[in-house]
Amino acid sequence: KGNGMSILELNEKNNKPILLVLGGSLGAKQINNLIYQNIEWICQNFTVIHQTGLVNNSNDTEANLVHTYGTSYKPFSFIHQNMQDVLSCADVVLSRAGANSIWETAVLNKPMILIPLCGAGTRGDQVDNALYFESKNCAKVLIGENANSINLKDSLLYMLDDKNRSNMQEQLKLLVGQNMPAKTIAKTIIEGIEG
C-alpha cells in the first residue's frame, strides 16, 4: 500500500476504505455521473480516487469537489505509470468489466463493483465477465437499468463492511488460484506451437 499512498499523497492513517473508480483512459460518463450523484455520501464513507478520463472530465466540477471534500476526493484524468501502486492501495475497485482490468484487479485481491458496457453497440463480453465474477462472489454488478445511484450506494454500503470485503477477497484467492491464468496462457501458447 505504501507506494500508492505516497503517490496519492494520502496519510497512512487514513481511516476510511479507499475506493478506486476507473472508467478507462477515455473515462465513462455513466460511472462519473453515478459517482457525482452520490458524492457526499461516498466521500463521508470512502476516500475516493477517481480516474475521470481524458474526455469526460470537467475541471470545474473536479475543482469544486476537491474544495468541498478535500483529501476524501482525488480526481485524475488518467493514472499513467503508477496504476499498479494505486490499485494496490485500493480497498474496493469500481470499474467497467473488461477482461484485462478485472483479472488484474482479481490477482491483486481487490473486491469489485462492476458496471459493464452493455447494449447494442457492444460485444457483450463485459456483461459476461461481470456476471462470471458475480457468480463467484467476487464482485457486485450493476447492469443496464440497475446501474443507478440507489443500487451503487447499496453496493458501496455492502463494501463498507470489512467482513464482506474479506469474504470477497477469500473468493478472489480461490478464483485466481484455481484458474492459474499464467499457466493457462502458457499451455495455450505451447499447444498452438506444437500444433
What are these model-predicted stretches?
Residues S95, P111-R123:
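Short hydrophobic beta-strand element within catalytic cores of glycosyltransferases
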Residues K136, K140-I143, A147-N164:
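C-terminal "capping" alpha-helix adjacent to the active site of nucleotide-linked donor transferases
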Residues S88-A90, A106-I113:
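Conserved donor-binding/catalytic loop of nucleotide-activated donor transferases
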Residues N164-Q178:
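A short, well-ordered alpha-helix in the C-terminal region of glycosyltransferases
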